[in-house]
Swiss-Prot record:
Residues bound to substrate: 66, 111-115, 172, 177, 246-247
Protein family (similarity comment): Belongs to the dihydroorotate dehydrogenase family. Type 2 subfamily.
Biological process per Gene Ontology, one example term: 'de novo' pyrimidine nucleobase biosynthetic process
Biological function: Catalyzes the conversion of dihydroorotate to orotate with quinone as electron acceptor.
Membrane topology type: Peripheral membrane protein
Name assigned to this protein: Dihydroorotate dehydrogenase (quinone)
GO cellular component terms, semicolon-separated: cytoplasm; plasma membrane
NCBIfam families in alphabetical order: PRK05286.1-1, PRK05286.1-2, PRK05286.1-4, PRK05286.2-5, pyrD_sub2
Gene designation per UniProt: pyrD
Location relative to the cell: Cell membrane
Entry keyword set: Cell membrane, Flavoprotein, FMN, Membrane, Oxidoreductase, Pyrimidine biosynthesis
Binding residue positions for FMN: 62-66, 86, 139, 172, 217, 245, 268, 297, 318-319
Record flagged with keyword Cell membrane: yes
Length: 336
């Protein structure tokens, strides 16, 4: 009930400043009795996926809590899973500000953050302090100054450091804001990366005596042929899941709107149909061989149901959470 008033105040601020202010407050309460201020009781609706049991099918998408600073406070809101990151081996500032823009009328966001984060070691320390009892995903990427040809080394470094603490590991090769990153989605580059990741997963499984599933996050801007090739590679390399989708470079649904021409990835409602169509095509191609986590423009129960009807086993929210707040979590989990 209160969120529309909170949103009105936050939307008076620059988008990144609003995010920083919100996280400043969440950091103060995370892991303390004051978490009760944001706690919501949601029904248990367990889902088995990637060998894990999720308390409910709704997760928080990567990008909101990049450094894992507010895991417990976000968990108290009712998410069945939380995906933190994207994190890189070394800290990096990301792209120059301003780099986050609202498209208020479309309930969309454009970001060109550029994997700003405090590095994987810092994230691991934050995860160690958390008491969240849902599934914790950790989304990993490469540093901006790491050549794409050596990009797989960054993923392997992150895997080593997070493996003991992750419920699952998400491989981000689809952000449009790190130069060259999306080229890792194609052909030989993808095969090389997935081979290295599976070998590392096998080694770490032996070392830690536990199996941590791997999901690959893909872009919504893949052609039909590219999508078929990606699906084939994921199956051949025994990847455990696929997250569809990341943000889009397509601006066709937001032409003429304020901020529509900003460089970066578009998320929120304008991405909804495009991501659902990718999920549908991907589901047909995979034919049940690995599960899909659906993300992109989910801002209602209906939108969440559409993702599941298209073939997703689980769903995630980000922009919808910014525009609708914690009540959206309870609404989706209750009625999905």
């Amino acid at each position: 009930m209160y969120y529309p008033f909170v949103r009105k105040a936050l939307f008076q601020l620059d988008p990144e400043r609003a995010h920083e202010f919100t996280f400043q407050q969440l950091r103060r309460i995370t892991g303390t009795p004051f978490e009760a201020l944001v706690r919501q009781k949601v029904p248990a609706k367990p889902v088995n996926c990637m060998g894990l049991t999720f308390k409910n099918p709704l997760g928080l998408a990567a990008g909101l809590d990049k450094d894992g600073e507010c895991i417990d406070a976000l968990g108290a809101m009712g998410f069945g899973s939380i995906e933190i990151g994207t994190v890189t081996p070394r800290p990096q500032p990301g792209n120059d500000k301003p780099r986050l823009f609202r498209l208020v009328d479309a309930e969309g966001l454009i970001n060109r953050m550029g994997f700003n984060n405090l590095g994987v070691d810092n994230l691991v320390e934050n995860v160690k302090k958390a008491h969240y009892d849902g599934v914790l995903g950790i989304n990993i990427g490469k540093n901006k100054d790491t050549p794409v040809e050596q990009g797989k080394d960054d993923y392997l470094i992150c895997m080593e450091k997070i493996y003991a603490y992750a419920g699952y590991i998400a491989i981000n090769i689809s952000s449009p804001n790190t130069p060259g990153l999306r080229t890792l989605q194609y052909g030989e580059a993808l095969d090389d990366l997935l081979t290295a990741i599976k070998n590392k997963q096998n080694d770490l499984q032996v070392m830690h005596h536990k199996y941590v599933p791997i999901a690959v996050k893909i872009a919504p801007d893949l052609s039909e042929e590219e999508l078929i090739q990606v699906a084939d590679s994921l199956v051949r390399h025994n990847i455990d899941g696929v997250i569809a989708t990341n943000t889009t470079l397509d601006r066709s649904l937001v032409q003429g709107m304020k901020n529509c021409d900003q460089t970066g990835g578009l998320s929120g409602r304008p991405l909804q149909l495009k991501s659902t169509e990718i999920i549908r095509r991907l589901s047909q191609e995979l034919n049940g061989r690995l599960p899909i986590i659906g993300v992109g423009g989910i801002d209602s129960v209906i939108a969440a149901r559409e993702k599941i009807a298209a073939g997703a086993s689980l769903v995630q929210i980000y922009s919808g959470f910014i525009f609708k707040g914690p009540p959206l979590i309870k609404e989706i989990v209750t009625h999905i």
